[in-house]
């Protein structure tokens, strides 16, 4: 937010929440860099404010031993390109990126991985139509999962591959069953192997 008093209140609340997370001993904490909509006229100031807030919250994540990751977001949100996301975190050592495959609508997943590289700290995996976020099971949209897996291998990524899919697009957008999650994950692995 632009209002400094409200920004400080929000960040203090988030710092308190991070402190309470210590009970669960998280390895990673994922934060969004903004809400939306964000007009172009205030974007630069919002980026500055987000960077300040993240730097402040990083100290609290460090206190509980958690890796702080900032998630890419779609539409007019901050961090809607890998370049902008890196701009937000560039002066904050140790902060990484949560790559949400379903949020990057301005390019390919390969471009995102190549640009962010080793700063990818965790992944939220779901598929979409390259227009807007859909949260479909992976392999049900337009992402080329085998290519994405090779790109991740190319940067040495060995972290979490967390499904964040809420819809089984091939079954009338019903909630995915565990069996369907396994089925789509096996498709990803087979696609990866077939591209070697």
Regions found by a protein language model. Name each.
Residues 1-96, 106:
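Active-site acidic/histidine proton-transfer and metal-coordination neighborhood
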Residues 19, 27, 51, 55, ...:
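Histidine-acidic metal/acid-base catalytic patches
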């Amino acid at each position: 937010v632009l209002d400094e008093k409200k920004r400080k209140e929000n960040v203090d609340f988030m710092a308190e929440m991070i402190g309470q997370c210590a009970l669960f001993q998280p390895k990673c904490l994922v934060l969004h860099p903004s809400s939306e909509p964000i007009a172009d006229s205030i974007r630069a100031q919002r980026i500055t404010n987000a960077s300040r807030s993240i730097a402040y919250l990083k100290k609290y994540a460090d206190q509980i031993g958690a890796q702080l990751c900032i998630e890419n977001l779609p539409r007019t949100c901050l961090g809607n390109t890998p370049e902008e996301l890196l701009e937000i975190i560039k002066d904050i050592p140790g902060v990484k990126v949560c790559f949400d495959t379903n949020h990057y609508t301005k390019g390919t997943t390969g471009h995102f991985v190549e640009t962010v590289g080793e700063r990818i700290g965790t992944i939220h995996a779901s598929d979409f139509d390259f227009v807007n976020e859909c949260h479909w099971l992976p392999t049900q949209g337009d992402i080329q999962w085998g290519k994405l897996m090779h790109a991740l291998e190319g940067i040495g990524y060995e972290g979490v591959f967390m499904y964040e899919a809420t819809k089984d697009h091939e079954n009338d957008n019903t909630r995915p069953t565990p069996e369907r999650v396994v089925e789509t994950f096996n498709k990803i692995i087979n696609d990866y192997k077939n591209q070697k």
